[in-house]
Regions:
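Transmembrane alpha-helical insertion/packing segments
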Residues: 11-97
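Membrane-helix interface "capping/anchor" motifs
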Residues: 69-79, 97-103, 120-130, 200-207
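Transmembrane alpha-helical segments of multi-pass membrane proteins
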Residues: 78-93, 136-139, 211-220
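C-terminal membrane-adjacent module
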Residues: 138-237
Length: 237
């Protein structure tokens, strides 16, 4: 199971109170890393995909510096940032150059899968915990899109003229709201919430995985809602 090998350090940051230990701050940071950049990354990648992808370099550099020279929680933020860097780069690659090919989404997002799995057994376990949970959330979202019949609309929306894309998104919204699809999405959400709960109970890096998975699902849902309700401001079209 993700991140079961070692518990998180209980040392706090200089500004952290007794309740803001690693068990709270690291999952909270994971949530912020998932949520904060998403609605900024989509339009940035659309306008300057190469610049967005190259931003991975300073992210990784900062992560390595933290891991090697940081102390306490600062050191643990390094591997967490490495995991985020992998997800960031994958998103830039797909949405920058392959966005009209939905079948390539998951393979591109999984480009660092071997490294993430290998990292679970060493000092980069937090990187693997974050990346793998983010990948699982992405896989769940793509599966839901495929099972609800939205996958064929994906390339149509992205390649359509600006005047037609909102209409296609409205059609997608109507498809999602069909009773069978609502039941399917609800069942998948309940299953994944159960997975998050089990990971959270394990503590350690698994708690980071739980927070990352939950945040990924929530953000994907919000992004889909934004695309359906306010397509021009979502960065999708």
């Amino acid at each position: 199971m993700i991140g079961t090998s070692t518990a998180l350090s209980s040392r706090s940051l200089p500004f952290a109170g007794p309740l803001l230990s690693a068990e709270i701050l690291l999952p909270l940071t994971a949530v912020l890393l998932v949520a904060v950049p998403v609605f900024l990354q989509a339009p940035l990648v659309r306008q300057a995909p190469l610049a967005a992808a190259l931003f991975t370099l300073p992210l990784v550099a900062a992560a390595v510096l933290l891991e090697r020279h940081g102390r306490g929680l600062w050191q643990q933020f390094g591997p967490l940032l490495v995991g985020f860097s992998g997800s960031w780069l994958a998103g830039c690659l797909f949405w920058g150059w392959f966005r009209e090919h939905p079948l390539l989404h998951l393979p591109i997002e999984a480009f660092a899968l071997p490294l993430a799995l290998a990292g679970l057994g060493g000092r980069w376990r937090l990187a693997g915990a974050f990346y793998l949970a983010s990948l699982l959330g992405t896989a769940a979202t793509d599966t839901a899109i495929a099972l609800t019949g939205l996958m064929p609309l994906w390339p149509q929306v992205l390649s359509a003229p600006l005047s037609e894309a909102p209409l296609l998104l409205r059609q997608a919204g109507e498809t999602v709201l069909e009773p069978a699809n609502i039941a399917l999405v609800t069942a998948m959400a309940a299953l994944l919430i159960g997975v998050c709960a089990q990971l959270w109970k394990q503590g350690g890096p698994a708690r980071v995985s739980a927070a990352t998975l939950a945040a990924t699902l929530a953000v994907d849902g919000l992004f889909l809602a934004a695309a359906l309700l306010a397509p021009l401001s979502s960065g999708l079209i």
